[in-house]
Amino acid sequence: MNDILAKILAVKAEEVATARQMRSEAELLREAQARQDVRGFAQAIEDKIAQGKPGVIAEIKKASPSKGVLRENFDASEIAASYAAHGAACLSVLTDVQFFQGSHDNLRRARAACPLPVLRKDFILDPYQIISARAMGADCVLLIVAALSPTQLRDLEAVAMDLGMDVLVEVHDEAELDVALGMKTPLLGINNRNLRSFETRLETTLNLLPRIPAGKRVVTESGILQPDDVQLMRRHGVQAFLVGEAFMRAEEPGAELARLVA
């Protein structure tokens, strides 16, 4: 595991330990189970694709470790409503505080501002974080193969599915893909950004495509900046996209989404 990812995960472990002291997992689980409002994340992507349109997961993030602050004028509710008005299938909201300047409140506010399903984008390593995600309103969680063992991945996926949530599993190379293909979720994210070097290559997705069986919905992540990038992926059968930076840097995120997929 690379240094940046290891550092983030160490912070996450501390965050979970602190959160558990403030609120028990049993209490949090009761709150999560009491919510009967899951929005179908994978289904929303499929519905958009069935209309002949790309399934865009539009991301809400203020900053990143590699790029710094992406958007000074940041209002999660406003951005979410703009995305929904311009054809996004789903939202992705960063909830990491230390590295991405995100928050749980951003997710709550984004979800309240529109009818779209929401992914909690964070570095998840403990069931507590998944239960917390559902309690705050998330409909889907991200599991990163580079950060977890195969056993952890299966166990965390089961926790999410028991709560009615979808799971987006993220890979970057062939070895990680082989692990991910053993999971139940149909949502397979391919991150074009190398978490070790932060270099971004769209070929990462294209090179892994031949190894992916039918029944998996590929979501290409990172480096989708221009309409040409979307068209390239669609020509190769990739119909789902997770895009953040290109939208966050634009004056009007929703309008940039519409331009990207036009």
UniProtKB/Swiss-Prot annotation:
InterPro entries: Aldolase_TIM (IPR013785), Indole-3-glycerol_P_synth (IPR045186), Indole-3-glycerol_P_synth_dom (IPR013798), Indole-3-GlycerolPSynthase_CS (IPR001468), RibuloseP-bd_barrel (IPR011060)
GO biological process: L-tryptophan biosynthetic process
Reaction(s) catalysed by this chain's protein: 1-(2-carboxyphenylamino)-1-deoxy-D-ribulose 5-phosphate + H(+) = (1S,2R)-1-C-(indol-3-yl)glycerol 3-phosphate + CO2 + H2O
Keywords associated with the record: Amino-acid biosynthesis, Aromatic amino acid biosynthesis, Decarboxylase, Lyase, Tryptophan biosynthesis
This protein's record includes keyword Transport: no
Molecular functions per Gene Ontology: indole-3-glycerol-phosphate synthase activity; phosphoribosylanthranilate isomerase activity
Pfam families assigned: IGPS
EC class of the enzyme, as a word: lyase
S-S bonds: none
EC number, as in UniProt: 4.1.1.48
Pathway membership, UniProt: Amino-acid biosynthesis; L-tryptophan biosynthesis; L-tryptophan from chorismate: step 4/5
Record flagged with keyword Amino-acid biosynthesis: yes
NCBIfam families assigned to the protein according to its UniProt record, in alphabetical order: PRK00278.1-6, PRK00278.2-4
Family affiliation: Belongs to the TrpC family.
Name of the protein this chain belongs to: Indole-3-glycerol phosphate synthase
Organism whose genome encodes this protein: Bordetella avium (strain 197N)
